[in-house]
């Protein structure tokens, strides 16, 4: 089943708010919408989407400034905040005419964006599968100890050099949170959107500055609190793909996720970018989840 380093599907492009955004859109029927986070792209789902072939319209979008989507110009520290990403993604999903039986498959910042969208469009959501997600606002004590100093540095002036010049999120954080070594071809695919030093890498710095930690940024904390409260009560069917050992959805956040109603849980091997360690297990679980939601 594995495609290895080969991308799944063919990239399509659409103009959103004056910028060109990239997405994959394969198959027909009700959509299964796969959304990546930082610093990845739709490429993250290449070995998972094939498991869902024939179960619906398979869509994976590249966030603005990431993957093959356009960069924002002018760029700077104020760009690529959560609210700006949400504006672009909302408009893209609206343009894709998703209908009212959407299954969301979300990870990392794709989870925050997806959970937020689902709360605001709950009547259109058939189910939510999530993994290594931003399920609620957190404190620094909840953050993985081995990564805490680095992520605190990202939120300081030091982050500018670490990310914009040294490309630390792609070169260090990404491979460091995958259990297996990535091939040169796989690393090349992840590097490609961020080869140029400077503002081209801004999305990968803005994202860690948006994590709702210790009350900041206030707008993202409020959004995460709202969707966390909703998910903890919503009857919408859920699939929690737990990671062992995991990185983000661990400890207090994992315990909170396990309280959500109408939820199935499986566990797969992986740290944070678990799609690179357990794609077949993840793909099979998502396919089984969709089949239960959409019996023939």
UniProtKB/Swiss-Prot annotation:
It catalyses: 1-haloalkane + H2O = a halide anion + a primary alcohol + H(+); (3R,6R)-1,3,4,6-tetrachlorocyclohexa-1,4-diene + 2 H2O = 2,5-dichlorocyclohexa-2,5-dien-1,4-diol + 2 chloride + 2 H(+). Induction: Constitutively expressed. Changing residue 244 to Q: 38% of wild-type activity. Its main location: periplasm. Changing residue 108 to N: 58% of wild-type activity. Competitively inhibited by the key pollutants 1,2-dichloroethane (1,2-DCE) and 1,2-dichloropropane (1,2-DCP). It is found in: Periplasm. GO terms for molecular function: haloalkane dehalogenase activity. Residues 31-155 form the AB hydrolase-1 domain. Chloride binds at residues 38, 109. It is an enzyme of class 3 (hydrolase). The active site is at 108 (nucleophile), 132 (proton donor), 272 (proton acceptor). InterPro entries: AB_hydrolase_1, AB_hydrolase_fold, Epox_hydrolase-like, Haloalkane_dehalogenase_2. Changing residue 109 to L: Loss of activity. Pathway: Xenobiotic degradation; gamma-hexachlorocyclohexane degradation. GO terms for biological process: response to toxic substance. The keyword Chaperone does not apply. Changing residue 38 to D/E/F/Q: Loss of activity. Belongs to the haloalkane dehalogenase family. Type 2 subfamily. Catalyzes hydrolytic cleavage of carbon-halogen bonds in halogenated aliphatic compounds, leading to the formation of the corresponding primary alcohols, halide ions and protons. Has a broad substrate specificity since not only monochloroalkanes (C3 to C10) but also dichloroalkanes (> C3), bromoalkanes, and chlorinated aliphatic alcohols are good substrates. Shows almost no activity with 1,2-dichloroethane, but very high activity with the brominated analog. PANTHER family: EPOXIDE HYDROLASE. Is not N-terminally processed during export, so it may be secreted into the periplasmic space via a hitherto unknown mechanism. This is Haloalkane dehalogenase. The lineage of its organism: Bacteria, Pseudomonadati, Pseudomonadota, Alphaproteobacteria, Sphingomonadales.
């Amino acid at each position: 089943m594995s495609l290895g380093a080969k991308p799944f599907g063919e990239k399509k492009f659409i103009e959103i708010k004056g910028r060109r955004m990239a997405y994959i859109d394969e198959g027909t029927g009700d959509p299964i919408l796969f959304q990546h986070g930082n610093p990845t792209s739709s490429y993250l789902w290449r070995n998972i989407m094939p498991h869902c072939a024939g179960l619906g319209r398979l869509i994976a979008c590249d966030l603005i400034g990431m993957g093959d989507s356009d960069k924002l110009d002018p760029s700077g520290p104020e760009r690529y905040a959560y609210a700006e990403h949400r504006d672009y993604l909302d408009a893209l999903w609206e343009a894709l005419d998703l209908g009212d039986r959407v299954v969301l498959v979300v990870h990392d910042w794709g989870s925050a964006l997806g959970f937020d969208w689902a709360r605001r469009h709950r009547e259109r959501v058939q189910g939510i599968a999530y993994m290594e997600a931003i399920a609620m606002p957190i404190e620094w004590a909840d953050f993985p100890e081995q990564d805490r100093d680095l992520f605190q540095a990202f939120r300081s002036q030091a982050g500018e050099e670490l990310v914009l010049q040294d490309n630390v999120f792609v070169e260090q954080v990404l491979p460091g949170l995958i259990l297996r070594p990535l091939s040169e071809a796989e690393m090349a695919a992840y590097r490609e959107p961020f080869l140029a030093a400077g503002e081209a890498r801004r999305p990968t710095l803005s994202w860690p500055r948006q994590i709702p930690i210790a009350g900041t940024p206030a707008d993202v904390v409020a959004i995460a609190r709202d969707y966390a409260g909703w998910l903890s009560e919503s009857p919408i069917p859920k699939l929690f793909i737990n990671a062992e050992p995991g990185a983000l959805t661990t400890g207090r956040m994992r315990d909170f996720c396990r309280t959500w109603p109408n939820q199935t849980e499986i566990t797969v091997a992986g740290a944070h970018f678990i799609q690179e360690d357990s794609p077949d297990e993840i793909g099979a679980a998502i396919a089984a989840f969709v089949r239960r939601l959409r019996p023939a």
